[in-house]
């Protein structure tokens, strides 16, 4: 759908495009709300009944899982409950497993609390019951049946305004029953941004409050990761969160991140160089593997399946995402090792990749995810079954189409950008507006880093693309997102999605 731009109607247009009402953006109602969902109260009751027990926290290795673990660890410290934590490495596999249950038993743990995992760990839950280990679960992943455990917190069991929460947000919601802790709130908001679960209702409350705290106080755990630069939504999404995720992506154990996020300033400063070094390695390796992935693509295919021993398991999701962004086709990227294919899938918004592959999940050793993203493992010998399914069962596309707002070059100024800032953060349920400039003209084209075209428009505006298909000279229309220029603070930039 196309919308004609009017400065005065801009706010209403964005809400209309996203089918969002003003109540969804109103966070005031969450400040003093007394929340009493039955399953959360049961979880509280069970946790307090284990006050004299020994608890093992089992987190996940991504930013959401790390944040959830840090939040609950702070809570257990506050409650003076004896505990420890364990973040499985990628080589261990995802989440709660029989191996972890056996380890817990060997080390005399009475209770396991699974954070950002556990909802589908049926074998591990069965073993825990046999070994008389109690299990509590805070998770937000898809499930078929409620897991067999002592207590369970999941967004699907909460009322409407609290659905679509990350594990970190759920953990903060639970911890707020006991005490008010700003650092836990910051981690709840950060996890919400990292897991792309939505930015409306309670999620918006968390993110906005997080940002207020970060701008008014020295939260050194975050500021150090952001190189002590100005904090905004982009710096969190493209600098802080990737550093947290880089540790496990590159094969290192993420337990160190919980230590960092709960450490003193001196401890964080000492750990920071290693985190930055690993993240720099992640950037270089992603670029190298992306070039390998592109060399494997047959552009005539409707669905890309890319397999290489060169792909690091932890980078498969990033590679799949970059492929989908570049080629607009669903993609599975697999690391091949010891007869196993471990990887990730991504698709654009018009395809429910998770649902499509769920129809054949019996061929996978493990499978999970969300609408446009999934993680999966299968035996190499079963690859032909997957290929046969994809060839015979064409993936369905919905009528989804990105809405655009038509603007003139003279409409783009800092007044418009300030209106965008007031609507931030954007996410899956409040999408960042795409602007289309027809009759686009520019005064000069330059190449950034020898490969990214940048078009200079006027004193305050330029347009840049990081997609190879957009390196053109002859075009009249630009579609893209409005950003502040990272290098020239008094200038704006259009991040180009498409040229025609």
Predicted segments — roles?
Residues 2-111, 130-133, 148, 179-384, ...:
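Hydrophobic helix-and-loop "lid/oligomerization" segment in the mid-to-C-terminal part
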Residues 48-52, 266-269, 277-307, 358-500:
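Mid-to-C-terminal polyanion-binding domains and interfaces
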Residues 62-65, 92-93, 117-121, 487-488:
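Acidic, metal-coordinating catalytic cores used for nucleic-acid/nucleotide bond scission
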Residues 87, 137, 152-154, 189, ...:
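Structural signal for conserved beta-strand scaffold positions within catalytic alpha/beta enzyme cores
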Residues 99-102, 167-170, 415-421:
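Short, surface-exposed amphipathic charged segments that create phosphate/polyanion-binding patches used
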Residues 114, 119-128, 135-197, 203-206:
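Conserved phosphate-handling catalytic cores of large alpha/beta enzymes
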Residues 151-152, 339-347, 489-499:
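Short, well-ordered strand-loop elements centered on a beta-strand within folded domains, enriched
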């Amino acid at each position: 759908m196309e919308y004609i731009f009017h400065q005065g109607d801009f706010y209403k247009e964005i809400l209309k495009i996203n089918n969002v009402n003003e109540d969804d953006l109103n966070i005031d109602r969450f400040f003093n709300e007394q929340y009493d969902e039955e399953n959360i109260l049961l979880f509280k009751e069970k946790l307090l009944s284990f006050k004299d027990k020994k608890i093992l926290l089992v987190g996940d290795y991504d930013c959401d899982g790390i944040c959830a673990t840090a939040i609950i660890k702070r809570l257990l410290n506050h409650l003076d409950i004896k505990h420890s934590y364990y973040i499985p490495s990628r080589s261990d596999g995802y989440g709660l497993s029989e191996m972890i249950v056996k380890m817990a038993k060997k080390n005399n743990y009475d209770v396991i609390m699974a954070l950002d995992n556990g909802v589908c760990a049926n074998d591990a839950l069965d073993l825990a019951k046999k070994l008389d280990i109690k299990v509590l679960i805070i998770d937000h992943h898809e499930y078929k049946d409620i897991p067999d455990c002592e207590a369970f917190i999941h967004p699907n069991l909460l009322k409407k305004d609290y659905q679509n929460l990350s594990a970190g947000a759920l953990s903060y919601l639970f911890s707020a029953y006991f005490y008010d802790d700003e650092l836990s709130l910051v981690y709840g908001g950060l996890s919400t941004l990292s897991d792309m679960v939505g930015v409306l209702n309670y999620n918006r409350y968390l993110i906005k409050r997080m940002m207020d705290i970060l701008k008014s106080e020295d939260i050194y755990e975050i500021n150090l990761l952001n190189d002590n630069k100005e904090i905004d939504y982009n710096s969190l999404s493209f600098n802080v969160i990737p550093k947290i995720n880089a540790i496990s992506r590159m094969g290192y154990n993420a337990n160190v991140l919980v230590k960092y996020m709960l450490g003193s300033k001196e401890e964080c400063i000492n750990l920071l160089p290693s985190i930055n070094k690993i993240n720099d390695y992640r950037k270089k390796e992603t670029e190298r593997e992306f070039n390998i992935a592109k060399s494997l693509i047959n552009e005539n295919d409707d669905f890309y399946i890319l397999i290489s021993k060169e792909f690091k398991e932890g980078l498969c999701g990033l590679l799949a995402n970059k492929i989908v962004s570049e080629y607009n086709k669903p993609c599975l990227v697999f690391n091949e090792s010891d007869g196993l294919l471990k990887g990730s899938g991504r698709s654009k918004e018009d395809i429910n990749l998770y649902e499509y592959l769920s129809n054949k999940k019996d061929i996978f050793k493990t499978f999970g995810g969300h609408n446009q993203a999934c993680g999966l493992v299968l035996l190499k010998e079963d690859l032909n079954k997957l290929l046969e399914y994809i060839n015979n069962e064409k993936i369905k596309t919905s009528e989804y189409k990105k809405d655009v707002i038509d603007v003139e070059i003279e409409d783009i100024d800092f007044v418009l950008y300030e209106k965008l800032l007031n609507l931030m953060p954007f996410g899956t349920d409040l999408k960042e507006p795409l602007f289309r400039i027809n009759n686009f003209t520019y005064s000069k084209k330059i190449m950034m880093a020898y490969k990214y075209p940048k078009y200079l428009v006027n004193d305050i505006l330029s347009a840049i693309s990081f997609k190879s298909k957009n390196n053109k000279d002859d075009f009249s229309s630009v579609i893209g997102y409005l950003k502040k220029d990272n290098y020239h603070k008094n200038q704006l930039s259009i991040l180009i999605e498409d040229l025609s």
